[in-house]
């Protein structure tokens, strides 16, 4: 049976884990690392690079390298590469395919089923886009679960005792979530993890802290050299990498040096060099507004759950950005001096929790029940542009709610159902999820027809809406796919393209290996000829040398079949060298053997002669004819 995995599809880094013997294990990637950079690049040759290898070449390939694509999930953003428009789902699918390949290599078996995480505050369109990305990558997405919930799942099973209230503070590379969960364990060790409230900001994360450093560096260069680096893509990429490194160093040091040579040139040809020192105090001062934005979601969660800070038993920090001292201090301040739990790895805990949930769904773990919530209220637009909520935020999912509405005009033949997600009073201020029309309503005065609108949120947090005219029985339904809505045929096309790209990449790898082997064989054969020229006939030397040159010539081109043919011909010719050398070796061995036998015979005669004085009696040979003559 194919293995199920848990995947944390992150803004900056991604991680994959699985259950081994019922216990979660983080899977090491092909490069030997436990996390994979969420970076995708398209090389000039058309090869798709993912992870560390894509990140390393970003400076020299800025326009064809995509990072932090998670921030575009659920939007109509695209990137044009060689005339093809790539959606966020397709870029994310490349990251998932890399994780899938590495997991299959690690486990030695196919990986098809996955639980993929997303920020708790992701709206419906973003969740649907995440699920579509998994589908394009060739995965059967068992469930989409919230990142803080996954973290609590991983933490709670290991550390949780009876009825503990856990606050998960999740600040990643691009998103921020706060979730409050209650973990209960019965006498049999069965855990129930229930989300009580969640809140967040989908556009707040480590990338924003990096950007503050970049802006500061750009400003310093402008003041010193009069050069605006904000328009220079290559310089900006170098600054981005330096800013990220500086941010990390300031988590353990009170200051860091940022030094870069030849960033750009001034109009008069003077090279732009950068050599700045950034202190932690200055960094915290320039990012204080970002830190302030973390307060509101925290306070909202406590308000929605109806609890005070003293009711929180444990605080769990998730996401690499929580390593920043200012963030840790803020959490301590917000929670009334509580020390955050340091027992979980903030980069891996989400994937570990997702792996546990995959085991629960597949039946490998029967000791836990997870109850999640919808992060945003759902409703429809009614007369006057009002947002009429059918499902309030923080409602446990899956859930289903219905409400009866009517027409606004006499003899109205149809109604337009406009679905929104959000907390504002007017529909226009919320996120539009989709629109559909219920037609064929029987003529009647306004307010008479009864139209039942039903919202159904599944365990992935994805919304299904239906409307039914109770008078005529006519019904219309839709699955909300949001602004990024990809129809099924579009997803199927993307799946096929992704498979084709994977096949192309595999072929490209095989071709590269063929060329490497051919090149090595050409040079080893050439060396063999040069080392044994005195033992080989001129004909053989010429034939093999010609074949070596033919193979080298084939290697200059792009035709792999030509390389294979040339290598086969060289192999055939090179066999003659082996035959000659082995034949000569055999002849030399035979000659040496004959010489040794002769020497042994001579030794035997000498031995006989030397022994004649002893007890040896020599026979006398008598010639009969000679004897007769003598008589």
From Swiss-Prot:
What's a single GO CC term here?
peptidoglycan-based cell wall
Q: Any signal peptide, and if so, which residues? A: none
Asked if the Swiss-Prot or TrEMBL record annotates the protein with the keyword Membrane, the reply is no
UniProt xrefs under Pfam families: HSP70
**InterPro entries in the cross-refs:** ATPase_NBD, Chaperone_DnaK, Heat_shock_70_CS, HSP70_C_sf, HSP70_peptide-bd_sf, Hsp_70_fam
- Acidic residues biased stretches: 612-631
Q: Name one GO molecular function term.
A: unfolded protein binding
**Keywords on this record?**
ATP-binding, Chaperone, Nucleotide-binding, Phosphoprotein, Stress response
Region Disordered: which residues? 586-631
Q: What induces it?
A: By stress conditions e.g. heat shock.
Stretches with biased composition (Low complexity): 602-611
Q: PANTHER family this protein is in? A: HEAT SHOCK PROTEIN 70KDA (PTHR19375)
Q: Which family does it belong to?
A: Belongs to the heat shock protein 70 family.
HAMAP family per the record?
Answer: DnaK
Q: In UniProt terms, what function does this protein have?
A: Acts as a chaperone.
UniProt protein name: Chaperone protein DnaK
Q: Which organism is it from?
A: Bifidobacterium longum subsp. infantis (strain ATCC 15697 / DSM 20088 / JCM 1222 / NCTC 11817 / S12)
């Amino acid at each position: 049976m194919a293995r199920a995995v848990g995947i944390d599809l992150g803004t900056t880094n991604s991680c994959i884990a699985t259950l081994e013997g019922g216990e979660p294990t983080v899977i090491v990637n092909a490069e030997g690392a436990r996390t994979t950079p969420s970076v995708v690049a398209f090389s000039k040759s058309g090869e798709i690079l993912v992870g560390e290898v894509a990140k390393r070449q970003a400076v020299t390939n800025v326009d064809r390298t995509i990072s932090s694509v998670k921030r575009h999930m659920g939007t109509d953003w695209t990137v044009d590469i060689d005339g093809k428009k790539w959606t966020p789902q397709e870029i994310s699918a490349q990251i998932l395919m890399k994780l899938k390949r590495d997991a299959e290599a690690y486990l030695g078996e196919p990986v098809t089923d996955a639980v993929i995480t997303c920020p708790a505050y992701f709206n419906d369109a973003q969740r649907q886009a995440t699920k579509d990305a998994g589908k394009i990558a060739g995965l059967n997405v068992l469930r989409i679960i919230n990142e803080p919930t996954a973290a609590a799942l991983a933490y709670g099973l290991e550390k949780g005792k009876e009825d503990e209230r856990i606050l998960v503070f999740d600040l990643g590379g691009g998103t921020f979530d706060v979730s409050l969960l209650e973990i209960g364990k019965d006498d049999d060790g069965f855990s129930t993890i229930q989300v009580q409230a969640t809140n967040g900001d989908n556009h707040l994360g480590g990338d924003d802290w990096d950007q503050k450093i970049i802006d500061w560096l750009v400003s310093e260069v402008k003041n010193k050299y009069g050069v605006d680096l904000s328009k220079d893509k290559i310089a900006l990429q170098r600054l981005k990498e330096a800013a990220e490194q500086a941010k990390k160093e300031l988590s353990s040091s009170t200051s860091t040096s940022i030094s870069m040579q030849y960033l750009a040139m001034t109009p008069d040809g003077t090279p732009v060099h950068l050599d700045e020192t950034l202190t932690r105090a200055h960094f915290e001062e320039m990012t204080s507004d970002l830190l302030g934005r973390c307060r509101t979601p925290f306070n909202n969660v406590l308000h929605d759950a109806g609890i005070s800070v003293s009711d929180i038993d444990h605080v769990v920090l998730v996401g690499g950005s929580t390593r920043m001292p200012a963030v840790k201090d803020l959490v301590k301040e917000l929670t009334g001096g509580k020390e955050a739990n340091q027992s979980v790895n903030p980069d891996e805990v989400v994937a570990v929790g997702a792996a546990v949930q995959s085991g629960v769904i597949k039946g490998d773990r029967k000791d836990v029940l997870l109850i999640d919530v919808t992060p945003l209220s759902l409703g429809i637009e009614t007369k006057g542009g009002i947002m009429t909520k059918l499902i309030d935020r923080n409602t446990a999912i899956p859930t289903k709610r219905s409400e009866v509405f009517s027409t606004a005009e006499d003899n109205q033949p149809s109604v337009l159902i406009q679905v929104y997600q959000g907390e504002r009073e007017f529909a226009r201020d919320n996120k539009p999820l989709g629109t559909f029309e219920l037609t064929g309503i029987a003529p009647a005065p306004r307010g008479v027809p009864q139209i039942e609108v039903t919202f159904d949120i599944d365990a992935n947090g994805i919304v299904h809406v239906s409307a039914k005219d109770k008078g005529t029985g006519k019904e219309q339904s839709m699955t909300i796919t949001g602004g990024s809505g990809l129809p099924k045929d579009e997803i199927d096309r993307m799946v096929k393209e992704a498979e084709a790209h994977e096949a192309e990449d595999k072929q490209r790898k095989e071709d590269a290996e063929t060329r490497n082997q051919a090149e090595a064989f050409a040079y080893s054969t050439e060396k063999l000829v040069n080392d044994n020229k005195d033992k080989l006939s001129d004909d053989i030397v010429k034939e093999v040398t010609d074949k070596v040159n033919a193979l080298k010539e084939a290697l200059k081109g792009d035709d792999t079949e030509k390389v294979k043919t040339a290598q086969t011909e060289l192999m055939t010719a090179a066999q003659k060298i082996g035959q000659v050398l082995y034949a000569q070796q055999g002849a030399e061995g035979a000659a040496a053997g004959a010489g040794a036998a002769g020497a042994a015979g001579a030794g035997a005669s000498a031995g006989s002669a030397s022994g004649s004085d002893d007890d040896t009696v020599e026979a006398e040979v008598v010639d009969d004819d000679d004897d007769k003559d003598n008589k």
